Amino acid sequence: CWSSLLTPRAIFYRFEKGLHKTDISVAVVVQKMVQSEISGIAFSVHPITEDSNQLIIEAGYGLGEAIVSGSITPDSYVVEKDLKKIIDINISEQKKAIVKAGKDNNWIMIDKEKRSVQKLSNEKILELSELVIKIEHHYGFPCDIEWAFERGKFYIVQSRPITTLKKII
């Protein structure tokens, strides 16, 4: 873990963000591996339009690694925060997913009848939206959140500030 602080990418990031003169520390978190049926990313502020009244959720089958790595194109859902209303749904065909198999992660093929189905129901989109809003309010800044859905329950596996916004929100 400590060596990751000294990679060129990490050093450049700290200089770019003005953090090169601050003390740096590393925390190690141990958490349960969630065998997610569906997983994804959520942004508490729309990352493209930077509209602070919209959040965006991306969802795909299996583990979130497939989305984070860019290996699949996830569904995307835009929610208007103050009205708690879904205003846009884009469903992507997903042919494969990463799943936990013993000690490894493996790619599996998605059944043809499920490939073009909306990954999260509208009800679940709104439920996850509430969690995203609570996390943003808790931290007091726009958040980039990784989530997993297993056996009817959402798990938040990571939350961090959105660092790409140009506007100050």
Residue ranges of each PLM-predicted region?
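Conserved mixed alpha/beta core segments that line enzyme active sites in large multi-domain catalysts
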Residues: 1-169
